[in-house]
Protein backbone atom coordinates (compact mmCIF):
# COMPACT_ATOMS: atom_id res chain seq x y z
CA UNK A 1 0.00 0.00 0.00
CA UNK A 2 1.41 3.38 -0.97
CA UNK A 3 1.69 6.07 1.64
CA UNK A 4 -1.38 8.26 1.80
CA UNK A 5 0.70 11.40 1.40
CA UNK A 6 1.99 10.18 -1.99
CA UNK A 7 -1.53 9.43 -3.18
CA UNK A 8 -2.71 12.89 -2.06
CA UNK A 9 0.26 14.50 -3.80
CA UNK A 10 -0.72 12.72 -7.00
CA UNK A 11 -4.32 13.94 -6.68
CA UNK A 12 -3.07 17.49 -6.19
CA UNK A 13 -1.02 17.17 -9.39
CA UNK A 14 -4.09 15.94 -11.27
CA UNK A 15 -6.11 18.95 -10.14
CA UNK A 16 -3.30 21.34 -11.11
CA UNK A 17 -2.97 19.69 -14.52
CA UNK A 18 -6.69 20.12 -15.17
CA UNK A 19 -6.56 23.74 -14.03
CA UNK A 20 -3.68 24.76 -16.32
CA UNK A 21 -4.44 22.44 -19.26
CA UNK A 22 -6.14 25.10 -21.38
CA UNK A 23 -3.34 27.62 -20.78
CA UNK A 24 -0.70 25.13 -21.89
CA UNK A 25 -2.69 24.06 -24.93
CA UNK A 26 -3.31 27.63 -26.11
CA UNK A 27 0.36 28.59 -25.61
CA UNK A 28 1.51 25.60 -27.66
CA UNK A 29 -0.87 26.55 -30.47
CA UNK A 30 0.47 30.12 -30.42
CA UNK A 31 4.06 28.88 -30.72
CA UNK A 32 3.20 26.97 -33.88
CA UNK A 33 1.56 30.06 -35.42
CA UNK A 34 4.35 32.56 -34.64
CA UNK A 35 7.27 32.59 -37.06
CA UNK A 36 9.71 34.99 -35.36
CA UNK A 37 12.17 33.62 -32.85
CA UNK A 38 11.65 36.45 -30.35
CA UNK A 39 7.89 35.84 -30.39
CA UNK A 40 8.46 32.16 -29.74
CA UNK A 41 10.69 32.99 -26.77
CA UNK A 42 7.98 35.20 -25.27
CA UNK A 43 5.39 32.47 -25.56
CA UNK A 44 7.88 29.95 -24.21
CA UNK A 45 8.19 32.17 -21.12
CA UNK A 46 4.41 31.97 -20.69
CA UNK A 47 4.63 28.19 -20.88
CA UNK A 48 7.11 28.20 -18.01
CA UNK A 49 4.94 30.37 -15.75
CA UNK A 50 2.51 27.65 -14.53
CA UNK A 51 3.75 25.47 -11.65
CA UNK A 52 5.85 22.43 -12.48
CA UNK A 53 3.34 20.01 -11.03
CA UNK A 54 0.76 21.17 -13.55
CA UNK A 55 2.67 19.49 -16.38
CA UNK A 56 0.99 16.27 -17.57
CA UNK A 57 4.34 14.48 -17.75
CA UNK A 58 4.61 14.58 -13.94
CA UNK A 59 1.49 12.45 -13.44
CA UNK A 60 1.76 8.76 -12.59
CA UNK A 61 -0.84 6.15 -13.26
CA UNK A 62 -1.54 4.46 -9.94
CA UNK A 63 -3.40 1.32 -8.94
CA UNK A 64 -6.73 2.54 -7.61
CA UNK A 65 -6.80 -0.12 -4.88
CA UNK A 66 -3.25 -0.04 -3.54
CA UNK A 67 -1.83 3.19 -4.96
CA UNK A 68 1.15 1.35 -6.45
CA UNK A 69 2.78 3.50 -9.17
CA UNK A 70 4.53 0.71 -11.08
CA UNK A 71 3.37 -2.30 -13.03
CA UNK A 72 -0.11 -0.97 -13.82
CA UNK A 73 -2.39 -2.22 -16.56
CA UNK A 74 -4.19 0.66 -18.25
CA UNK A 75 -7.22 -1.41 -19.22
CA UNK A 76 -8.05 -2.29 -15.62
CA UNK A 77 -6.38 0.46 -13.57
CA UNK A 78 -4.85 -2.21 -11.34
CA UNK A 79 -1.30 -3.24 -10.57
CA UNK A 80 -0.08 -6.63 -11.75
CA UNK A 81 -0.29 -8.56 -8.50
CA UNK A 82 -3.78 -7.24 -7.66
CA UNK A 83 -4.90 -8.06 -11.19
CA UNK A 84 -3.62 -11.62 -10.80
CA UNK A 85 -5.40 -12.02 -7.46
CA UNK A 86 -8.66 -10.78 -9.02
CA UNK A 87 -8.29 -13.20 -11.93
CA UNK A 88 -7.76 -16.15 -9.61
CA UNK A 89 -10.76 -15.16 -7.49
CA UNK A 90 -12.88 -14.90 -10.69
CA UNK A 91 -13.69 -11.27 -9.98
CA UNK A 92 -12.71 -10.17 -13.50
CA UNK A 93 -14.77 -12.08 -16.05
CA UNK A 94 -13.38 -13.24 -19.37
CA UNK A 95 -9.84 -13.89 -18.19
CA UNK A 96 -8.23 -17.27 -18.59
CA UNK A 97 -5.27 -18.59 -16.69
CA UNK A 98 -2.26 -19.47 -18.71
CA UNK A 99 -0.63 -22.79 -17.94
CA UNK A 100 2.48 -24.13 -19.57
Swiss-Prot record:
The UniProt entry's sequence similarity note says: Belongs to the universal ribosomal protein uS14 family.
Query: Keyword set for this entry?
Result: Chloroplast, Plastid, Ribonucleoprotein, Ribosomal protein, RNA-binding, rRNA-binding
- Which compartments does it reside in? Plastid, Chloroplast
Q: Name one GO biological process term.
A: translation
What terms describe the molecular function in GO for this protein? rRNA binding; structural constituent of ribosome
| Record bears the keyword Transferase | no
Q: How does it assemble?
A: Part of the 30S ribosomal subunit.
Transmembrane region(s): none
Please name the InterPro entries in this protein's record. Ribosomal_uS14, Ribosomal_uS14_bac/plastid, Ribosomal_uS14_CS
Domain of life per record:
Eukaryota
* Protein name, entry field: Small ribosomal subunit protein uS14c
Task of the protein: Binds 16S rRNA, required for the assembly of 30S particles.
One Pfam family this sequence matches: Ribosomal_S14
Any one GO CC term of the record: chloroplast
Region span, Disordered? 1-54
